[in-house]
Design a protein with these regions (language model features):
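Catalytic center-proximal scaffold of phosphoryl-transfer enzymes
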Residues: 1-269
Length: 269
């Protein structure tokens, strides 16, 4: 049997419509999770810039949810999160600041920026020493967590101690205009209470890798295709990504999952 490109596009769009209840259920599961990770990346729809937002949750029934929006504003993140009130893992993009709940910022991003700072100022012992001192905070936290399980009270005490040390490192340079360490020092102060939640909460990741991995296929397809041509195309692309990435994360057979959806006739669109 031969299928034209148009026929394939129509089938995929109908499949996306047919699975709307499944995707709504996945979003509800994500919002009910105690932990969620978010990230965003650029996407073009009909030549216009927009963003794909990725929402990922851990646990035995993980969720991977993709959403396209023309905007990269923080309101998109809060709308997508809905009534979520758990710990949100993200990078340091200001759009996530609108979330009023508990936050864990990504240490992978901070460590990369510290490494760049050291490389750019390798001959400045003060800069290198400061960056290494911030890195030691992370290493100390991980070393403590790699040992025997800590009681909740001890985890809280450790987190407070690390936050206090981060504050002292931050205030050292935050007021010195033009100093190489100033930007990251201000970041430490701005997010002082969002750097060591992973110490307080067992199982909470210190990085945002789950959301970043979710968006990697989006980045690859963007480079190959340039994006989508219409709103229908974007909706279909996000629907397929949500389902297939969730099935993959749960170790499910995508072919069997598709068959269960296609057991009933696809709707006309």
């Amino acid at each position: 049997m031969r299928l034209s490109t148009g026929a394939l596009a129509d089938l995929l769009e109908r499949f996306g419509h047919a699975t709307a209840p499944e995707r709504a259920a996945l979003l509800a599961q994500a919002r009910a999770s105690p932990v969620a990770h978010m990230d965003e990346t650029g996407w073009r729809e009909n030549g216009q810039n927009g963003s794909v937002w990725g929402l990922a949750t851990p646990g035995p029934q993980p969720v991977r949810y993709d959403h396209y929006d023309r905007s990269r504003a923080g309101s998109v993140a809060t709308d997508l999160l809905g009534d979520f009130d758990g710990h949100l893992g993200s990078d340091f993009y200001g759009g996530y600041n609108r979330y009023a709940g508990q936050h864990q910022r990504c240490w992978a991003h901070l460590l990369r920026d510290l490494h760049t700072l050291k490389e750019d100022h390798a001959t400045d012992a003060g800069v290198v020493g400061w960056a290494q001192a911030v890195r030691v905070l992370y290493d100390d936290a991980q070393a403590a967590l790699d040992g025997p399980p800590l009681p909740a009270a001890l985890r809280t005490t450790l987190a407070r101690q690390l936050e206090a040390q981060a504050f002292r490192l931050g205030v050292r340079y935050t007021g010195l205009k033009g100093h190489p360490c100033r930007a990251l020092a201000r970041r430490l102060l701005r997010h002082q209470g969002e750097l060591f939640e992973f110490v307080r909460v067992p199982g909470l990741s210190a990085d945002n890798n789950a959301a970043e991995r979710l968006l990697r296929p989006v980045v690859v397809q963007r480079k190959i295709s340039g994006g989508t041509r219409s709103a229908h195309g974007s909706t279909t692309r996000m629907a397929l990504a949500t389902l297939f990435e969730t099935w993959r994360a749960r170790g499910l057979n995508a072919f069997h999952e598709c068959l269960s959806v296609l057991h009933f006739p696809l709707p006309q669109v």
